[in-house]
Amino acid sequence: MVMLESGFTWLPAFLWRLHKFWRGVRMETPWVDRAPLEIVRSNIRFSLQPVDAPPEPETLNRLFDHMQSDELILFSTDYPHWQFDGDEVLPQGLSPDLVRKIMVDNPMATYSRLSQSVRA
């Protein structure tokens, strides 16, 4: 599942809360055998836009660390909406490796049929 235009900066706090709640009810739900973070990492992706993070690069990088995954975010532009970010689509301060994951690797892994059309 891909969540578009939902933002992603709320995710670390939400996952922390889910994990805490899950630990408290594990005895009552033995069929839920994986932690919420694992379930989200294997099944859900989020679009980059809108970036609702503070403009400081350190804060954004810390958010990615708290999510414990660089595979959750997919490139998006929010075009053609009026609040489209234009040339400032990518937040400042992301490492080249993370930019490649967001713009190429994560979309190719999420939309596996894309890789077939690229090869053709």
List PLM regions with ranges:
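Aromatic-lined glycan-binding groove of carbohydrate-active enzymes
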Residues: 1-43
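Mid-to-C-terminal alpha-helical segments outside catalytic/metal-binding sites
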Residues: 10, 27-35, 45, 49-50, ...
